[in-house]
Amino acid sequence: MKKTGLLALIAVLAFTLITAGCGGSTQKAEAPKDAVAADIKAIKDRGVLKAGVKVDVPKFGYKDPQSGKVEGFEIDLTKAIAKKILGDETKIDVQGVTAKTRGPLLDNGEVDMVIATFTITEERKQTYNFSDPYFIDGVGLLVKKASGITNLKGLDGKKIGVAQSATSKKAVQEEADKVGAKVTFLEFGTYPEIKAALDSGRVDAFSVDTAILFGYLDDSTTILSERFSPQQYGVATKKSNTALAKLVNDTLSDMKKSGELDKLIQKWGLK
């Protein structure tokens, strides 16, 4: 081959390689169709779903003092979500939370989600992703039978115990203003503390969502018939964990359609 021909061939090959290389560098790499989102992958790699749950709310999330086992409606929902992600409903790690601690534990990544009688509000939706509601309840009042109190107006001049950072305080205050009842609120860290305060006379009423109150009802107390401000419970996840939020919502939606959600509500005597 002549020298000029050889040089021409080399030039053509070089141009072809350069063109191919440039073309490849401008194309975006396509993610595999079965790629797993980072937030879901983190759970899969860990092998366990971490959930913040209530441990002092009978029927929703309650830790048996004898066995140490946490059971309830929301625990069963957590298991269903774990099964969706990991294929095994037992792969859960539940951590007890209160109305005051559930947000910070989610913020710092100690839990993947919070499913703990967490009421959906517009303000909270600015900070967290919330699923569609899986349970709706109204705020109620638990009082001592011997008190003779039969309605909210009868609490005029009385003290009402509520949980820290809970929505029940605002709901009751708004209704109290409507009926002209001047009430004082005392805030507590846990529901058992509020019940103890009611039993000892430190407060005249215990206010929280009605389904929760039923777990603290005994022979000496009664739940007033009035209900205030419907509370919608949702599963909360960090704003950045959008894939997990979607998976949670899809799981709950499927459970509603199949009737499984209603079965669990009936199982725990919430309907």
Regions found by a protein language model. Give the residues of each.
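Bilobed "Venus flytrap"/periplasmic-binding protein-like clamshell domains
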Residues: 53, 70-85, 119, 137-190, ...
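C-terminal motif of bacterial Sec signal peptides marking the signal peptidase cleavage site
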Residues: 16-21
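Periplasmic-binding protein-like
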Residues: 55, 135-143, 210-253, 271
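A ligand-binding cleft/hinge motif common to bilobed small-molecule-binding domains
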Residues: 101, 118-126, 171-176, 196-230
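Extracytoplasmic small-molecule ligand-binding "clamshell" domains
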Residues: 31-37, 42-113
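Acidic, polar ligand-binding/catalytic clefts
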Residues: 79, 91-153, 221-222
